[in-house]
Amino acid sequence: MNDTFLKACRGEKTDYTPIWMMRQAGRYLPAYQKIRGKVSFLELCKNPALCVEVTLQPVDLLGMDAAILFSDILILMEAMGAKLEFNEGCGPVFPNPIKDQTALDALIIPDADDATGFVMETIRLLRGELQVPLIGFAGAPFTCATYLIEGGSSKVFWETKKMMFTQPELFHGIMEKITQATILYLQAQARAGAQALQIFDSWAGVLAPCDFEVFALPYVRRIIASLQQFDLPIIYFANNGSTLLEMSASSGASVLGLDWRINIGDAGKRVPGIALQGNIDPFALLLPKDKLRKRIGTILEDAKEVKGHIFNLGHGIHQFTPPEQARIAVDAVHELSCK
């Protein structure tokens, strides 16, 4: 087992900087596209054998130092009773967004092993195949709540923020229910064999720091506290969260994921003693080889004083990224960071 990723998460010395990429199992890989040509996205997410195949692809093809479970953060919302659709070209849709207490009351807190047993089976199967650590994950309550309230993706989050400020009790009720379900979901993943867990807060950066502290952070803290019994690295990724960095560090996470909008060395000085993950702009993978290697070298140099660095993108890899560019990045990180 190559445990370089786990060592970096714990802030231990490593022979080189480990790398994996958010959304590394996905649309940019021809092998993934071939599978998706036969099944819908939701069908794929619920098929353990296919999920195993997709999860393994970037590890086998590109040499990643960790695998991340192939799934989606909104699978849990469907298990809670929210009708979920994935429409080509417009992403996830909840046709019945939560607008009132009646809709909230209709959501359930499912038994994770029962309602999302296909996820746990995928984890168990992967542990028998992988020679690198397996990362499980869930969406942070705030990010998941935005989808339930907006009915899908949003650019301005009008419905979410309107509810926060005009119906705070309803908003907190939604967050409470999602939090309880997420705790059970991630605990089940840990029991199934996940070796690290990441909490994706894709939309945290739309919040003012004072609102993040009230409406989002307390729920993340509760989730992380509930996972301490498993002694696994917990990664918290708050996208566009440079203004939230110190508060994110108080979440209890072992590792903070960074987007590309902050210098990783500066981040390390602001939150000393915590491992950091990131943080090249996903579009920088399109650079010519020499310029990409130079960009990677700069990030590695900036991160030299960070106590534990996992190289990653600042967000998910873009679907039109040539796989060979991802391979160049993996090789560059390994070569340039070799101690």
Swiss-Prot record:
PROSITE patterns listed in its UniProt record: UROD_1
EC number annotated for this UniProt entry: 4.1.1.37
Cellular localisation: Cytoplasm
Listed SUPFAM superfamilies: UROD/MetE-like (SSF51726)
Keyword Lyase in record: yes
Family annotation (Pfam families): URO-D
Catalysed transformations (reactions): uroporphyrinogen III + 4 H(+) = coproporphyrinogen III + 4 CO2
Keywords: Cytoplasm, Decarboxylase, Lyase, Porphyrin biosynthesis
Site positions (Transition state stabilizer): 72
Residues that, per the record, bind substrate: 23-27, 72, 147, 202, 315
GO terms classed as biological process: protoporphyrinogen IX biosynthetic process
GO terms assigned for molecular function: uroporphyrinogen decarboxylase activity
Record carries keyword Cytoplasm: yes
CC annotations in GO: cytosol
Pathway(s) served: Porphyrin-containing compound metabolism; protoporphyrin-IX biosynthesis; coproporphyrinogen-III from 5-aminolevulinate: step 4/4
Classification via CDD domains: URO-D
Chief location of this protein within or outside the cell: cytoplasm
The organism's place on the tree of life at top rank: Bacteria
Function: Catalyzes the decarboxylation of four acetate groups of uroporphyrinogen-III to yield coproporphyrinogen-III.
HAMAP family xref list: URO_D (MF_00218)
Family: Belongs to the uroporphyrinogen decarboxylase family.
Subunit structure: Homodimer.
Name under which the protein is recorded: Uroporphyrinogen decarboxylase
